[in-house]
UniProtKB/Swiss-Prot annotation:
GO MF assignments: DNA binding; DNA-binding transcription factor activity
Gene: mycn
Native source species: Danio rerio (Zebrafish)
UniProt protein name: N-myc protein
Main localization (coarse): nucleus
Database matches in InterPro entries: Myc_transcription_factors, Tscrpt_reg_Myc_N
GO CC list: nucleus
Keywords from the UniProt entry: DNA-binding, Nucleus
Length: 93
């Protein structure tokens, strides 16, 4: 007996193509002249757009390396160091 039929679950959908619909790609499926694509990516489904963001390297999304994400500790005031420490600590009330 097939377990999927018993629970009436659908199989997992295929993964979205990685960066296949970014502007400038010759094989771009969603780039037709005058189409209403989401933010110029050629992706009409918001879930596809979100999937593409998850696949981008961190520098492409944030524009900074991991070490520069919160700035240098030397350039901050004592108050901001305390805020960062409280934000990222594992303590919960």
């Amino acid at each position: 007996e097939d377990i999927w039929k018993k629970f009436e679950l659908l199989p997992t959908p295929p993964l979205s193509p990685s960066r296949a619909a970014l502007p400038g790609d010759p094989g771009e499926l969603g780039a037709v002249a005058g189409d209403c694509s989401l933010m110029g990516f050629g992706l009409t489904d918001p879930l596809d757009w979100a999937s593409e963001l998850l696949l981008l390297p961190g520098d492409d999304i944030w524009g900074a390396s991991d070490g520069d994400l919160f700035g240098s500790v030397l350039d901050t005031t004592d108050n901001s160091i305390i805020i960062q420490d409280c934000m990222w600590s594992g303590f919960s009330a």
